[in-house]
UniProtKB/Swiss-Prot annotation:
It is found in: Cell inner membrane. This is Glutathione-regulated potassium-efflux system protein KefB. The keyword Membrane applies. GO terms for cellular component: plasma membrane. The gene is kefB. The chain crosses the membrane at residues 4-24, 29-49, 55-75, 87-107, 115-135, 152-172, 177-197, 207-227, 230-250, 268-288, 291-311, 324-344, 356-376. Keywords: Antiport, Cell inner membrane, Cell membrane, Ion transport, Membrane, Potassium, Potassium transport, Transmembrane, Transmembrane helix, Transport. Residues 400-519 form the RCK N-terminal domain. It holds the Pfam family Na_H_Exchanger. GO terms for molecular function: glutathione-regulated potassium exporter activity. Coiled coil: none annotated. NCBIfam families: 2a37 (TIGR00932), PRK03659.1 (NF002973). Belongs to the monovalent cation:proton antiporter 2 (CPA2) transporter (TC 2.A.37) family. KefB subfamily. Gene3D superfamilies: 1.20.1530.20, NAD(P)-binding Rossmann-like Domain.
């Protein structure tokens, strides 16, 4: 691809993402499906703006690579050891059972047994990028089904190595393609990467961090991710697996959070590029020619994988309410199928249109997953948002709620407990199904689902409630919910959680004045206690705390129209001087000994 063509392709990708994703989100079909539809639109079978799909698809795998690096950072070797049974138990069983069933079905459709084995293995894999993205959107990351889903995906990445090695054996060209000396060298190189990463990465990053130049740290992070990906690719292994290992090796380092911050912007853009590329690869010509075959293939593929995954989840002891989430989120074909089928095609294992039909099936199965997860959400909503069962009568009054609490993590739980202790009627909205199960056992009136859906808010009693408390983890969800409440339920008093000053500014701009910055009050209280330990009188420390809170809120309001860092820094310095002057004036006015305050808790 020429330089100008590459730049044009980049502009087209950005335009497609900017145009399609907000529209898809507004239609309620999710960002992933929006990316896929955008890819179809600009690809060779749509408007035809881009024709070199294979090269872009290979480049776009970097999105998966960055995602796996961040996932590795969130784990550590001890956590992986705890997951060993689910990885090598459920993960292995899923691949083997799905591959066997799908291979048998392919043989019934006139695939040779060798092609059927390769096809079954490729179709048994799921899309790491799509599954992890949907698990995050659905709040599954911390749940039992989310942990099990991650274990299955990790085993699938590990299975890439033997699957690729199996292709030339099935093609009957093992002697021609297998050089056992080269394989031994690759194994040694892989072991060398593990040992070198274990003992060299932290000293190297310590040296780079000592320079104090943030750009160099970001460059070093990119070098690590791309370098480990290329190294694994040169060995014929999964690039995503290489960066995952690099992330795990750094998971316990002091640079973990800085690494996540440096990588996150690249991960999001490249993941979007990956989904657009998958959409571009959809061969609409094959779809038109073999429409019935493709539709049946997609339905059978998704049904077989759901059956296997649901069965394994049940055997593993996953709660019944989480099994469908687990099965649905992994029901699609995966990006690894493109690699495996290309390798098999080069070995002439497939005949005629077999490879094209398989690739179309995989691509369309990816497009079914966001829609399938919406159906699962609706099913769970009907199951958990209907009338309580007789054996699960909560002590919460069944009257219309006074307060709706959105999100019931650690922040929301404190609020909910305080309200219930004062006999307030509350309803909780939560999208983590495992949390819903737990809260119902403790007697909370809780609805499952996405609180940004107007129908869910209405069924939860938003039209009769007096207030809504928003404690979402994601600032984007908070702002979207604020907009919905202001539009559809203007009578509600909106109270919200702000992660920091940026979110506080956004809430103020949206007209929300009742909010709490999650670390501000606790930090201010600890600061007051510090003043007391340094000799300040408890009453004076309390006054200082109140003055600081008042001044900080005033400064927060004044900074709303000021968007540049320079202006904000200048105003912050001015506010600090103003705070010091206030304290000095108070000290001059209070010349008396404050004996009434000996201790303040």
């Amino acid at each position: 691809m020429e330089g100008s063509d590459f730049l044009l392709a980049g502009v087209l990708f950005l335009f497609a993402a900017v145009a399609a994703v907000p529209l898809a989100s507004r239609l309620g079909i999710g960002a992933v499906l929006g990316y896929l539809l955008a890819g179809i639109a600009i690809g060779p079978w749509g408007l035809g703006f881009i024709s070199d799909v294979d090269e872009i698809l290979h480049f776009s795998e970097l999105g998966v690579v960055f995602l796996m690096f961040i996932i590795g950072l969130e784990l550590n070797p001890s956590k992986l050891w705890q997951l060993r049974r689910s990885i090598f138990g459920v993960g292995a069983a899923q691949v083997l059972l799905s591959a066997a069933l799908l291979a048998g079905l392919l043989m019934l459709t006139h695939f040779s047994w060798q092609a059927a084995v390769v096809g079954g293995i490729g179709l048994a894999m799921s899309s790491t990028a799509m599954a992890l993205q949907l698990m995050r959107e659905k709040g599954m990351n911390r749940s039992e089904s989310g942990q099990l889903g991650f274990s299955v995906l990790l085993f699938q990445d590990l299975a890439v190595i033997p699957a690729l090695a199996l292709v030339p054996l099935l093609a009957g060209s093992a002697d021609e393609h297998f050089d056992w000396m080269k394989i031994g060298m690759k194994v040694l190189a892989f072991v060398g990467m593990l040992i070198g990463g274990r003992y060299l990465l932290r000293p190297v990053f310590r040296f780079i961090a000592a320079s104090g130049v943030r750009e160099v740290f970001t460059a070093a992070t990119l070098l690590l991710v791309l370098g480990s990906a290329l190294f694994m690719d040169a060995l014929g292994l999964s690039m995503a697996l290489g960066t995952f290992i690099a992330g795990v090796l750094l998971a316990e380092s002091e640079y973990r959070h800085e690494l996540e911050t440096a990588i996150d912007p690249f991960k999001g853009l490249l993941l979007g590029l990956f989904f657009i590329s998958v959409g571009m690869s959809l061969n609409l010509g094959v779809l038109y020619t073999h429409l019935l075959w493709v539709v049946i293939s997609v339905v059978v593929l998704v049904a077989v994988k759901i059956f296997v995954l649901y069965l394994l989840a049940r055997l593993y002891g996953v709660r019944s309410s989480e099994r469908m989430q687990f099965a649905g989120v992994l029901s699609q074909g995966g990006e690894f199928a493109f690699v495996l089928f290309s390798s098999a095609s080069s070995q002439r294992l497939f005949q005629g249109d077999q490879m094209a039909l398989l690739l179309v099936t995989v691509t369309l199965s990816m497009m079914t997953t966001p829609l399938l997860m919406k159906l699962v959400d609706k099913w769970l909503s009907r199951q958990f948002n209907g009338p309580e069962e007789e054996d699960e009568k909560p002590w919460v009054n069944d009257d219309k709620p006074q307060v709706i609490v959105v999100g019931f993590g650690r922040f929301g739980q404190v609020i909910g407990r305080l309200l219930m202790a004062n006999k307030m009627r509350i309803t909780v909205l939560e999208r983590d199904i495992s949390a819903v199960n737990l809260m119902r056992k403790y007697g909370y009136k809780v609805y499952y689902g996405d609180a940004t859906q107007v129908d869910l808010l209405r069924s939860a009693g938003a039209e009769a409630a007096e207030s809504i408390v928003i404690t979402c983890n994601e600032p984007e969800d908070t702002m979207k919910l604020v907009e919905i409440c202001q539009q559809h339920f203007p009578h509600l008093h909106i109270l919200a959680r702000a992660r920091g000053r940026v979110e506080a500014h956004e809430l103020l701009q949206a007209g929300v004045t009742q909010f709490s910055r999650e670390t501000f009050s606790s930090a201010l209280e600890l600061g007051r206690k510090t003043l007391v330990t340094l000799g300040m009188h408890p009453h004076q420390a309390q006054r200082a705390q109140l003055h600081f809170r008042r001044l900080d809120m005033r400064m927060l309001r004044e900074l709303i129209p000021m968007h540049t860092d320079t202006v904000q820094i200048s105003r912050a310095r001015e506010a600090r001087r103003e705070l010091e002057e206030i304290f000095q004036r108070e000290m001059q006015q209070e010349r008396r000994q404050l004996d009434g305050w000996d201790e303040f808790e």
